[in-house]
């Protein structure tokens, strides 16, 4: 009969502590890139939708991650990460 392996990995941080630390890091990064009033409105929407629950914490983490990813991908002026617009040359053969 199979047995579950013993827990041999390193001690893990409890999920709720990890989630709150992640949320704090995301909030600190978000205020550098988005208007505070806009972020406050987002927080109010999450609170009105989920209340003071872990589901709300997970939702705002997910939304902030997506917003920051898209913001950096489009090309944040404060970051070296992102798409750099290039001029296309019309004289060469087209790629298809």
From Swiss-Prot:
One Pfam family here: VPR
Name under which the protein is recorded: Protein Vpr
Sequence similarity: Belongs to the HIV-1 VPR protein family.
Entry annotated with the keyword Cytoplasm: no
Subunit structure: Homooligomer, may form homodimer. Interacts with p6-gag region of the Pr55 Gag precursor protein through a (Leu-X-X)4 motif near the C-terminus of the P6gag protein. Interacts with host UNG. May interact with host RAD23A/HHR23A. Interacts with host VPRBP/DCAF1, leading to hijack the CUL4A-RBX1-DDB1-DCAF1/VPRBP complex, mediating ubiquitination of host proteins such as TERT and ZGPAT and arrest of the cell cycle in G2 phase.
PTM note: Phosphorylated on several residues by host. These phosphorylations regulate VPR activity for the nuclear import of the HIV-1 pre-integration complex.
Localization terms from the record: Virion; Host nucleus; Host extracellular space
Positions of the UniProt region annotated as Homooligomerization: 1-42
Function: During virus replication, may deplete host UNG protein, and incude G2-M cell cycle arrest. Acts by targeting specific host proteins for degradation by the 26S proteasome, through association with the cellular CUL4A-DDB1 E3 ligase complex by direct interaction with host VPRPB/DCAF-1. Cell cycle arrest reportedly occurs within hours of infection and is not blocked by antiviral agents, suggesting that it is initiated by the VPR carried into the virion. Additionally, VPR induces apoptosis in a cell cycle dependent manner suggesting that these two effects are mechanistically linked. During virus entry, plays a role in the transport of the viral pre-integration (PIC) complex to the host nucleus. This function is crucial for viral infection of non-dividing macrophages. May act directly at the nuclear pore complex, by binding nucleoporins phenylalanine-glycine (FG)-repeat regions.
Keywords (A to Z) from UniProt: Activator, AIDS, Apoptosis, Cell cycle, Host G2/M cell cycle arrest by virus, Host nucleus, Host-virus interaction, Ion channel, Ion transport, Modulation of host cell cycle by virus, Phosphoprotein, Transcription, Transcription regulation, Transport, Viral penetration into host nucleus, Virion, Virus entry into host cell
GO cellular component, as recorded: host cell; host cell nucleus; host extracellular space; virion component
Gene3D superfamilies linked to this entry: 6.10.210.10, VpR/VpX protein, C-terminal domain
Gene from which the chain derives: vpr
UniProt superkingdom: Viruses
Annotated InterPro entries: RetroV_VpR/X
């Amino acid at each position: 009969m199979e047995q579950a392996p013993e827990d041999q990995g390193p001690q893990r941080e409890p999920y709720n502590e990890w989630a709150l630390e992640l949320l704090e890091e995301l909030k600190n990064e978000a205020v550098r890139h988005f208007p505070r009033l806009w972020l406050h409105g987002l927080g109010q929407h999450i609170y009105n939708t989920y209340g003071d629950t872990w589901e709300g914490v997970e939702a705002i983490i997910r939304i902030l991650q997506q917003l920051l990813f898209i913001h950096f991908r489009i090309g944040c002026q404060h970051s070296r990460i992102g798409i750099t617009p290039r001029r296309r040359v019309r004289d060469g053969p087209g790629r298809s």
